[in-house]
């Protein structure tokens, strides 16, 4: 039996996993950042992808807070700080989103 805190953390990881799978699905035919910029459909994909990347970063921040910073360091091969930083860049960058950076992130 998991504690309420553990259930929340597991749910956050599941949301992250689902978001990553959607990102991969939505972007499987994107060959470079220009694919986002050359059509209205590409721009929609860029905007939607940014929202999921932002949600992933926010979920990672919540996990880190709920575990008092003790869980994420157990997986140092994952660039957690970059994930959270990308969230901040998208959330506060507004119209300064770099399509190349989003493409490389995905």
Task: Outline where the language-model segments fall.
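Solvent-exposed interaction patches of small proteins and small membrane subunits
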Residues: 1-106
């Amino acid at each position: 039996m998991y504690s309420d805190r553990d259930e929340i953390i597991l749910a956050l990881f599941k949301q992250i996993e689902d978001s990553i799978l959607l990102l991969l699905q939505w972007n499987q035919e994107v060959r470079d950042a220009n694919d986002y910029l050359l059509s209205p459909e590409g721009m929609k994909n860029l905007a939607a992808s940014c929202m999921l990347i932002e949600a992933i970063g926010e979920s990672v921040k919540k996990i880190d807070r709920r575990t008092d910073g003790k869980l994420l360091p157990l997986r140092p091969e994952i660039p957690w700080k970059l994930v959270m930083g990308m969230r901040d860049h998208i959330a506060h960058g507004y119209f300064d989103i770099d399509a190349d950076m989003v493409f490389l992130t995905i």
